[in-house]
Design a protein with these regions (language model features):
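Sec-dependent bacterial lipoprotein signal peptides
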Residues: 1-20
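Bacterial Sec-dependent N-terminal signal peptides
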Residues: 17-44
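A motif-centric signal for short, conserved binding hotspots located
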Residues: 40-169, 173-254
Length: 254
């Protein structure tokens, strides 16, 4: 009877040892499987060649897992917001200008984005202030003005859908200075996804398969024949502006 008890006890101990060992292995495997390493790249995406080199400095960072964009924030196109002393000043009498003019002191922005956007995570809403950098070097903002709708400030937007505030020149609408009902590159957003004009390079017309963020996967003029996820300015007029919101969100690349 005593030997039987010892055998039974030994079997129970062995069972729990095996159970604990298997449970530990499973948890270790799960942890390993859910770890996603950052993708390392050695060359900048071809689209970055479109950016205004007088305003931007773009380089790989964090060992090639991210891209850093430093910009003066000063665009290479005309606007009333340059001020009359600038060669790029454009008289726009119909624009209810904000008090500021462009200055290198307050437009400078530095952003760091993933070199390869993570499209497997959750969507993230855009916030106020800079949500991306345009090819001109200026900032891109979303469809909000302060905590209200853009309608309240629409009269202050220049011919290319931009104005200054708070102290930063930025686009809210389709920036007609470099994209106007076409497939041109607009810029890069904070999630590392490129933003293009209203038309798609692969079809030369308005895409019909966009998600809620204005994104889809197709070949672009910068992807060397490979399909990649990117955003478009959605071809829907905004309010009474007669133009189109640059990007509302949410981000898909976080």
């Amino acid at each position: 009877m005593k030997n039987q008890f010892i055998k039974t006890t030994s079997l129970i101990v062995l069972f729990f040892s095996v159970f604990i060992s298997c449970t530990s292995d499973s948890e270790s495997d799960l942890s390993t499987d859910t770890d996603v390493d950052d993708v390392v790249i050695t060359e900048l995406h071809a689209a970055y060649a479109e950016f205004n080199t007088d305003a931007t400095d773009i380089y790989l960072s964090n060992g090639g897992t991210t891209v850093t964009i430093e910009t003066t924030g000063l665009p290479n196109h005309e606007s009333v917001y340059w001020g009359e002393d600038s060669d790029l000043y454009l008289e726009e009498s119909e624009v209810a200008t904000t008090p500021s003019i462009m200055s290198s002191n307050n437009n400078a922005v530095t952003i760091t984005v993933d070199a390869t956007p993570n499209l497997t995570g959750s969507t993230v809403s855009t916030q106020l202030n800079t949500i991306g950098v345009a090819v001109s070097g200026a900032s891109i903002f979303n469809d909000q003005e302060g905590n209200g709708a853009l309608d309240e400030a629409a009269a202050s937007l220049d011919w290319t859908g931009a104005h200054i505030g708070p102290g930063v020149y930025h686009y809210h609408l389709e920036p007609k200075a470099f994209t106007n009902d076409d497939k041109n590159l607009v810029g890069i957003l904070l999630d590392g996804v490129f933003l293009y004009g209203r038309k798609c390079n692969s079809t030369d017309t308005y895409p019909t398969d966009l998600d809620t963020s204005g994104g889809h996967t197709s070949v672009t003029q910068h992807s060397d024949g490979i399909e990649e996820y990117h955003y478009h300015i959605i071809n829907e007029l905004y309010s009474t502006t007669g133009s189109y919101i640059a990007f509302t969100g949410p981000y898909q690349g976080y």
